[in-house]
Amino acid sequence: MEKSLNEVREAARKKIIYTQHALDAMNVEEEIVSYEEIRNVIFKGEIIEDYPEDKRGHSCLMFNYTLKQRPVHIVCSPKQEFLAVITMYVPTIDKWKDDFRTRR
C-alpha cells in the first residue's frame, strides 16, 4: 500500500477536491471536521483499506487521529491532476475495533 500512499499524497499536493457528499459529511453538526483535519489524515495518516476496483477508480480508506486526538476516516481517490475526497466520517466503536483500523 506504500505505492498507493505515495499516489494519494502526490495527487493531494497538486489539488484536493471534495465531493458534495464529503462536504456534507464534514459539516454534520455533532462532528464538524475541518479541511486541516482532512489534510492531516492525507499527509500524516495511513491507508487501512485499498479499493483498486472501485467504480470511481482506484480509491482507499485512510485513517489518522486529528490534532484534537479524535479518529477520522476518509475515502479518497487519487487522479492525475488532483485527489478526490469522496467521503469522511468519525469512526465509532460499534463498527470498528478500538484501534479504528479493523472492522468489527
Where are these regions (language model features)?
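Ribonuclease/tRNase effector modules and their secretory precursors
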Residues: 1-104
